[in-house]
Amino acid sequence: MRILFISSTRIGDAVLSTGLLDHLMRAHPEARFTIVCGRVAGGVFRRMPRLDRLIAVEKRRYSLHWLEIWGQLATTRWDLVVDLRASAIAWLLWTRDRKIIQGGRRPGHRLTHLAALLGVEPPPLPVIWTAPEDSARAAALLPEGRPWLVLGPTANWHRKVWPAERFAELALRLTSPDGVFPGAGIAILGGPGDQERSMATPVLTALPQALDLVGKLDLPEVAAVLARAAMFIGNDSGLMHLAAAAGAPTLGLFGPTPSDEYGPAGPKAQAVLADGPPGQGAMEDLPEARVLEAAKALISQAAQVPA
């Protein structure tokens, strides 16, 4: 059986789609998969089992990239095409069955929309795939012996970024002798590129003892690092979704984006909202004290979740 899975360009959306993909793998244990996704999101799928091909979409003018992708896929007879991009390509391929998500924005969480595409209830939660070498790298970076608080102070939009000084002060409080994680190590994650580095630099400067992992790991290694975290606290970003998928207690910080649509998903994941109407708040209006109390509550909640 051959399944074509057309996922997203952005890391966060790609991570959210892994639950649906994991469901397909369980439902069709004999199937082989081809994944089409954005270049940046490719690392989300690189380690998945039964992967035949991973095709990166490099955008072209006039959407000519889809013509190139079609050329790579048209000679295969597919058993199922799942298209999460609502592109025309799924209609132009030979397949026994196709599932194409409806375009446009709709109320409700993205996971619910994805699950409805295949009629799955409850919505399958995102997962991560890593290799032993990824776990070994993570273990070397975040050795056992003390807990690790991982911060994600970056985002793809400056308005989604919580003030750097609040990240730093929160980390110091959580790792203080009377904090939730006394003596814990602090690691700071972010993607490659100058923008990510510039967002993370003020936090790194304020926390000179922190482990700087910004732009230094690929996505499977990042996932393995997050799987070792005692807690992840970060802005609404792909890292936040990856942390929740990795099983880390995850606190997502939300202001101008709707947490009811894109909040972190999982039994140990929560969103903390800034003041103002949902999805219309300013990150400056998210008090540090609110995040601190949410972190304490989440740790208590996570302790009740079966391993």
Model features per residue range: what roles?
Residues 1-307:
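Catalytic machinery of carbohydrate-active enzymes
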